[in-house]
Every structure is written in C-alpha cells, then in structure tokens.
C-alpha cells in the first residue's frame, strides 16, 4: 500500500495494522515523507491515541533500520524510562544500571540526551567521561568484560533525524516520546521500562506482549518514569505472554517513604557529582534508597525474587565502593 493511502487511513480516524504501521514508519525513517506529511501523521496518531499494533509496527521499523549490535549469547537487561515526566530528578536508571552490573548482572542501557529534564542518560555519562559514541563492537566488549554498556540512541537510529525538526516544531509529545525504551538495538532479554504517565502502563504492557518480550516490568511511580519512594508505583509484569498488574509501595522494598524533592537533580555536571558520590558509598541516603529500589526490581528479572533482600544487598554494595570501580572501567572504552 502506498504511503498516501496509509496516511489517508490515519486522517479518516482509522487504525493501522502492525504491518501497515511498519511500512509507514519505514518510509519515515528512510526519509521518504515530507516534514508536512510526518507532522500530519504524528498529530493524527496523537489525537486518536496510538494503539498496540501501531506502536509495535513503529518499533519493528525502528529495529529493522537500526545499526546492528553483536548479539550476546547470555541473558541481559535494559533499564530505561521514557523521560518526559518533567520532574528533573537525578539519573536513577543510569546509576542502577552501573550498580546492577557491578553486582554481576549484564545491562545494555539504551539512552539519549535529555527530553525534559536538564540531564539525560547520555548527558550525565558524558559528564562522567564515558564515551557514549563507542562502536557497537566496543559496547559489546564492555558488556562482556564489565557487565554494562551504553547504547546512544542517536548513533543507532540515525533515520530519526528525519523526524527531529518536526518534533521540535510541534513542541508536543508524539509516539516518538514512547518509542525510545522499546527500541534498544541490542534487543535485551529482559526489560525494566519506565513510563511518564499512568495510562501508558497498560499500553506498554500490551505492546511488550506483542513484541514477545520474555520478561519485563513496566512501571510508573506517582509521576516518575521509575520506581517511586514518595508514593505508590504501578507495575505491569510481562512474562510468557501474560500480564499481571500490581502496586508496589516503599514498604514492599523495606524502605520508608521519602520526598520527591530529595531526588531533585540539576545540570549534567551536578548530577555526575551526585552519581559519583553514590557509587563511592558517600551519597545521600535518599539517593541510595531510590537507586536500591530500582536496582532491586531490575535484579528480580535475573531471578532474585526478594525485593527487600535485594535492597539490602544493593545498599551494602554501594557502601563497598565496588560500583564506582565499574564506572571507572566504563570510561576506558
């Protein structure tokens, strides 16, 4: 079907099938649509609300066009959020990725520059002297040797440059704001995915099933795209094609409720200082607790089922300073 027919289908309020969505997003990523067509398509999807098939198709097209990553023969995970929650916290998922890796898990973290905060994953890593532009082969080597690597979205999804000016001009959230966590080019075995809005938990969970995720958690934590300690966290667990919905509280992690204010971050350089202190075992208790809760859920994907025990193990590990050694090694690639 021609692009124009697919666009016409969207304009008339009809949904696209997964294969139709894949075809249309392939055209976008390969630069076959004008800015006006891309804008119209994104707004049509936004006004109606993209469904599971449309999101799955967009993910499929993104992965088909992504730069290849040498696939490992061992299980590994990603911990990544949509961003865009406007809360401007410290880089919790980036820190959790490094901590989990230094505890023996394998984490291929997909990330980008900041969406709405002052410091996205690649911003803070750059401030920490990590080269976010390593080749796929170098990233894979880091994953093999130290258990963690960073995949900079812009490097793997170069076709997204065709959408960038349109997104900038529209100044509103579009389907591209929710694609990021789902399009890790390493195609992880496990996923801990954070979403910026509670209504996205179900959409994301159903999309994860459509994408045949082996074992994933989707979380929204009282306004945050990660596990919260200032309120409840809504969770969807996706395993073997089935979804289970539940709520987690700070008590489930053996932790006390703490204010969201205590996790406020700043510019990349400031967040880098918080992160360094934390990995050296000298960080703020509230920062350590937030990272421990998120890392605890991440470790559950690797079979460590006791969240309270996981939290205690992470907190003890942070005090040891071993996680900082992992960060130092990451800067050598």
From Swiss-Prot:
Cofactor(s) it depends on: Mg(2+)
Residues noted as binding anthranilate 2 in the record, renumbered to the chain: 167
Cofactor comment: Binds 2 magnesium ions per monomer.
Keywords: Amino-acid biosynthesis, Aromatic amino acid biosynthesis, Glycosyltransferase, Magnesium, Metal-binding, Transferase, Tryptophan biosynthesis
Pathway: Amino-acid biosynthesis; L-tryptophan biosynthesis; L-tryptophan from chorismate: step 2/5
Species whose genome carries this gene: Haemophilus influenzae (strain ATCC 51907 / DSM 11121 / KW20 / Rd)
UniProt-recorded name of the protein: Anthranilate phosphoribosyltransferase
Binding positions (Mg(2+) 1): 93, 226
GO molecular function: anthranilate phosphoribosyltransferase activity; magnesium ion binding
């Amino acid at each position: 079907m021609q692009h124009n027919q697919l666009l016409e289908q969207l304009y008339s309020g009809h949904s696209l099938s997964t294969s139709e969505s894949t075809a249309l997003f392939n055209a976008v990523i390969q630069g076959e649509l004008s800015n006006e067509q891309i804008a119209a398509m994104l707004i049509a999807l936004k006004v109606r609300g993209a469904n599971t098939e449309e999101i799955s198709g967009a993910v499929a097209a993104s992965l088909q066009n992504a730069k290849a990553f040498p696939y490992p023969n061992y299980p590994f995970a990603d911990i990544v959020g949509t961003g865009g929650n406007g809360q401007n916290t410290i880089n919790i998922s980036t820190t959790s990725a490094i901590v989990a890796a230094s505890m023996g898990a394998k984490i291929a973290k997909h990330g980008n520059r900041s969406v709405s905060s002052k410091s996205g994953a690649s911003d803070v890593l750059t401030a920490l002297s990590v080269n976010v532009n390593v080749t796929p082969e170098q990233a894979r080597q880091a994953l093999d040797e130290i258990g963690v690597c960073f995949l900079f979205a812009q490097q793997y999804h170069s076709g997204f440059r065709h959408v960038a000016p349109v997104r900038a001009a529209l100044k509103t959230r579009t389907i591209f704001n929710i694609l990021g966590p789902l399009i890790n080019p390493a195609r992880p075995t496990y996923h801990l995915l954070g979403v910026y809005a509670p209504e996205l938990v179900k959409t994301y969970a159903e999309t994860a099933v459509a994408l045949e995720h082996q074992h994933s958690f989707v979380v929204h934590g009282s306004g945050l795209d990660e596990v919260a300690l200032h309120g409840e966290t809504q969770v969807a667990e996706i395993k073997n094609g089935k979804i289970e919905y539940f709520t987690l509280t700070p008590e489930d992690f053996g932790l006390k409720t703490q204010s969201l204010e205590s996790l406020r971050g700043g510019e990349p350089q400031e967040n880098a200082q918080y992160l360094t202190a934390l990995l050296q075992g000298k960080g703020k208790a509230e920062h350590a607790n937030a990272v421990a809760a998120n890392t605890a859920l991440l470790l559950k994907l690797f079979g460590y089922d006791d969240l309270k025990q996981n939290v205690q193990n992470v907190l003890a590990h942070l005090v040891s300073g071993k996680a900082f050694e992992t960060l130092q090694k990451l800067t050598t690639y």
